[in-house]
């Protein structure tokens, strides 16, 4: 009997959506507010790391960054814990990608929209029932009039109920895949295997597809997530301090198990020089 890993983990999420263009295209088509006739047919991956040429020197790394042949850009993020500045980060990333287009075209009319899809394993809009939140630049009074450029979507995974969007079959299947498949899965639902995209994704998260070192990193990732979630209700300053300590503790464990500084940095987001001092 096959065993499965949780697709929300950094290792598996990037394997499924960061290495298989057809799967990330299917996910984006199912969850983003794309106009009729403008669904994604072909997609190309771009480097997930972008170093802004701005005075603040802010670096940002996203999970998946890709573009279509017509120039539209797409950012996909899997966020395990909600933080107060995550919306700002999503806006910053989208704005940076939008502005960077001027490197190649000084004609503003050639600027193409940027879409940001943020999957969040936490509830952050506690006073509204909806779990999909679409932000865009609209006229305050005439909301049908908008400035094309940014579309930022947040999905609160814990609020997801299949019946609430039953008419959107692929959206339901992708969200069920993200919320139902994990190490306790004994039987994959038949409807998952009836979809070529979902069945491919299920195969990609089989535990047997990963090395011992990758599985150790997977377990350490969840250790770090547990620390972060424990601290999530703390005041922001305490939360950030605790999150940093959680990353350092994860790095110490990985270092003790023989992981390279580069691999530890990739998993934790810590700088290599910090890791070498541990």
Language model feature labels by segment:
Residues 1-152, 159-163:
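Accessory alpha/beta interaction modules
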Residues 155-159, 186-187:
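Short, flexible active-site loops
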């Amino acid at each position: 009997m096959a065993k499965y890993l949780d697709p929300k983990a950094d290792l598996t999420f990037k394997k499924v959506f960061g290495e298989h263009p057809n799967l990330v295209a299917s996910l984006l088509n199912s969850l983003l507010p794309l106009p009729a006739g403008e669904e994604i047919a072909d997609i190309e991956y771009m480097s997930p790391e972008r170093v802004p040429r701005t005075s603040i020197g802010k670096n940002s790394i996203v999970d998946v960054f890709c573009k279509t042949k017509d120039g539209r850009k797409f950012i996909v993020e899997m966020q395990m814990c909600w933080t107060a500045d995550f919306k700002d980060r999503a806006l910053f990333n989208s704005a940076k990608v939008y502005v960077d287009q001027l490197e190649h075209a000084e004609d503003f009319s050639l600027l193409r929209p940027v879409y940001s899809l943020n999957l969040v394993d936490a509830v952050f809009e506690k006073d509204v029932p909806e779990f999909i939140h679409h932000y865009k630049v609209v006229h305050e009074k005439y909301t049908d009039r908008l400035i094309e450029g940014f579309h930022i979507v947040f999905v609160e995974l814990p609020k997801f109920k299949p019946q609430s969007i039953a008419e959107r079959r692929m959206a339901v299947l992708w969200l069920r895949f993200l919320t139902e498949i994990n190490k306790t899965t004994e039987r994959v639902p038949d409807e998952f295997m009836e979809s070529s995209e979902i069945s491919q994704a299920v195969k990609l998260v089989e535990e047997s597809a990963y090395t011992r070192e990758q599985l150790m990193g997977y377990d350490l990732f969840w250790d770090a997530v547990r620390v972060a979630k424990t601290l999530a209700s703390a005041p922001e300053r305490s939360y950030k301090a605790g999150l940093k300590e959680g990353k350092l503790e994860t790095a110490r464990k990985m270092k003790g198990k023989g992981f390279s500084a580069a691999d530890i940095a990739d998993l934790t987001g810590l700088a290599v020089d910090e890791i070498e001092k541990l």
